[in-house]
């Protein structure tokens, strides 16, 4: 019951925020999500470099609609790695792990805000809906037909059959709904986009599972009752946004 209540509340809050919040408050909310997710990431990898990671991740969200800002931030991040190694006791691995966290979380959430700025709330909800439909159908298809493990060393319960179900239903959802929402460039493009979004989302889910397994924990945190942490909720989205964002940038 706790999982159901918190899930419904989270879904309702997300829907209201995306549908009704202007762009500036939405950026602030995305920054908060980035900060919470980055904090969980830093706990998982046990990184001593914390404040700068949080700041860079949030800066990526704030500057998401500026064309040159990702390159500027990436250059700053690389310089930061060099500075950390030269002027502190942190190793190259520690500094690089911190920078990766800022990119892994900040850049995708910045892309999500950019999608909202370019095409509005409907396109944003289309992406989120595709991820949710895919995740849900992976679960149910896997339970009904799952026989062959997808990545047993990382996520033993995920199956190839479940992944196929997620691809089919997620792609179908994006194609049918996207034809009404996105700038139309043919059903072939939408089907390809749907497949890429779902496959990237599956990779994002597996990547976060790898992080938690390496840390010896089940969830990234216990912030959301019954659902784990923020990173657990957005893991698929962080990867799935990339092909969706590139499509939006190229057709608008």
Predicted regions and their residues:
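Membrane-embedded alpha-helical segments of transport systems
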Residues: 137, 164, 231-239
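Interfacial loop-to-transmembrane junctions
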Residues: 213-237
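Juxtamembrane boundary at the C-terminal end of a transmembrane helix
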Residues: 245-252
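Short helical (or helix-break) motifs at transmembrane helix termini and adjacent helical loops
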Residues: 133-143, 201-213
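Membrane-embedded alpha-helical bundles of polytopic integral membrane proteins
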Residues: 1-196
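Transmembrane alpha-helix interface/packing and boundary motifs in multi-pass membrane proteins
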Residues: 197-201, 225
